[in-house]
């Protein structure tokens, strides 16, 4: 019973404090275009304050964006493809 009550208290907090992944958009609704991963990592971490980023399908894909940051609406297949972070 105690476990169930703890679960009910902690579960909503996890949803509020969660981070999201996606193509971050600027104030004009455009995504940063790219060819190199290092460029995207700099854009994502310094401009959008994400934890990291890389170039996925010629646009910067950011990991660990705050919930209040706007992201581009994409298909689930594209999101699952880009969620696999390339090492290197």
Swiss-Prot record:
GO molecular function: sodium channel inhibitor activity; toxin activity
GO biological process: one example: defense response
Disulfide bond annotation, renumbered to this chain: 34-55, 40-60, 44-62, 56-82
Signal sequence coordinates: 1-18
GO cellular component labels: extracellular region
Protein location: Secreted
Keywords of the record: Amidation, Disulfide bond, Ion channel impairing toxin, Neurotoxin, Secreted, Signal, Toxin, Voltage-gated sodium channel impairing toxin
SMART domains with a match to the protein in the record: Knot1 (SM00505)
Expression tissues: Expressed by the venom gland.
Chain positions with Isoleucine amide modification: 87
Domain of life: Eukaryota
InterPro entries: LCN-type_CS_alpha_beta_dom (IPR044062), Scorpion_toxin-like (IPR003614), Scorpion_toxin-like_sf (IPR036574), Scorpion_toxinL/defensin (IPR002061)
Name listed for the protein in its UniProt record: Beta-insect excitatory toxin BmKIT1
Species, as recorded: Olivierus martensii (Manchurian scorpion)
């Amino acid at each position: 019973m105690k476990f169930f009550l703890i679960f009910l208290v902690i579960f909503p907090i996890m949803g509020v404090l969660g981070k999201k992944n996606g193509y971050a958009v600027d104030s004009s609704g455009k995504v940063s275009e790219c060819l190199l991963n290092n460029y995207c990592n700099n854009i994502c971490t310094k401009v959008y304050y994400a934890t990291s980023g890389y170039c996925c399908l010629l646009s910067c894909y950011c990991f660990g964006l705050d919930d209040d940051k706007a992201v581009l609406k994409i298909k689930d297949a594209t999101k699952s493809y880009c969620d696999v972070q390339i090492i290197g």
